[in-house]
């Protein structure tokens, strides 16, 4: 359960600010385009004068966009395909939940817990600080908290 005030704060303040700041940075270099996933997948593509702004704010936008996309008012179970991949990677769904909870609760300061697909096509749990997105490490996020 996440209370209404927390949701409003994250949507109307945090996410809106990340998006505005990412757009402001991109306006300084229209030649690089606006595909944040592409840019963050290799941050050397981003001009140095806006690199950290895009890592922070572009990452914050992508992180929150995925978070909103995955929210649902009702409890949902993973599909058979996802459950099989989780069991292959973690042994059981309970072991996955333990690993994900540990990633979320042991992050010092601000950050995210992730279920990602790594470069080998396998699922893994990881944590990133602040608004860093796993895309910058060559991993595709599929669940973030």
Curated annotation (Swiss-Prot):
Which co-factors does it depend on?
Answer: Mn(2+); Fe(3+)
Q: Which reaction does it catalyse?
A: 2 superoxide + 2 H(+) = H2O2 + O2
The highest taxon in the source lineage is: Bacteria
Positions contributing to Mn(2+) binding: 10, 64
Q: EC?
A: 1.15.1.1
- Alphabetical keyword list: Iron, Manganese, Metal-binding, Oxidoreductase
Note describing how the cofactor binds: Binds 1 Mn(2+) or Fe(3+) ion per subunit.
Function text: Destroys superoxide anion radicals which are normally produced within the cells and which are toxic to biological systems. Catalyzes the dismutation of superoxide anion radicals into O2 and H2O2 by successive reduction and oxidation of the transition metal ion at the active site.
The text of the family note is: Belongs to the iron/manganese superoxide dismutase family.
Protein name as catalogued: Superoxide dismutase [Mn/Fe]
Q: What is the lineage of its organism?
A: Bacteria, Bacillati, Bacillota, Bacilli, Lactobacillales
């Amino acid at each position: 359960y996440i209370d209404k005030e927390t949701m409003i704060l994250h949507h109307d303040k945090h996410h809106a600010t990340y998006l505005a700041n990412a757009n402001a940075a991109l306006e300084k270099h229209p030649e690089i385009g606006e595909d944040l996933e592409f840019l963050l997948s290799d941050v050397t593509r981003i001009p140095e004068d806006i690199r950290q702004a895009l890592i922070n704010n572009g990452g914050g936008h992508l992180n929150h966009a995925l978070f909103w996309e995955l929210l649902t008012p009702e409890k949902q179970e993973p599909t058979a395909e996802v459950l099989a991949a989780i069991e292959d990677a973690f042994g059981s769904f309970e072991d996955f939940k333990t690993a994900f909870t540990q990633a979320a609760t042991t992050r010092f300061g601000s950050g995210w817990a992730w279920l990602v697909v790594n470069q080998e096509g396998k699922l893994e749990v990881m944590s990133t600080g602040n608004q860093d997105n796993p895309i910058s490490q060559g991993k595709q996020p599929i669940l973030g908290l």
